[in-house]
Amino acid sequence: MALLYADEDFSYPVVQRLRQLGHDLLTAHEAGQAGQSITDTAVLAFATAAGRAVVTFNRRHFIRLHAEVSSHAGIIVCTRDDDVLALADRIHQQLQSVPTLQDQLLRINRPARA
C-alpha cells in the first residue's frame, strides 16, 4: 500500500479510512508540522524526504508545484467531498491503479451532483 503524507488541511476522517484500507499515512499534526505556516514547497520537500506522497485539498498550489518540481514522491490533489468514505474509496481505487506515485500527480475529483 501507499506511503502518504496528509497536509494540515486534509480531512482526518479520510485519513482514518485510508488507514483502514491499509495505507500508511502520516499527518502534518503527527509530524509536528501543523500550525507553523509551512509553505507548500516545504510540505512537498518534507514528504519527499520521507518517501511519502502528499495528499491535499490544495489543488491549485500543488498542481503548480508538480509542474515546477522535477522530482517528488507523488502528489494527490482532491476535491473536497462531504462523503468522506466515498472520497477515501476513490483515492484508494486510484492508488491501486498506478504502479508508482514517484513524480506522479493524481487528481481525485468529486463526482458531479445529480
Predicted features, each with a name:
Residues 52-65:
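Acidic, metal-binding active-site segment of PIN/NYN-like and related structure-specific nucleases
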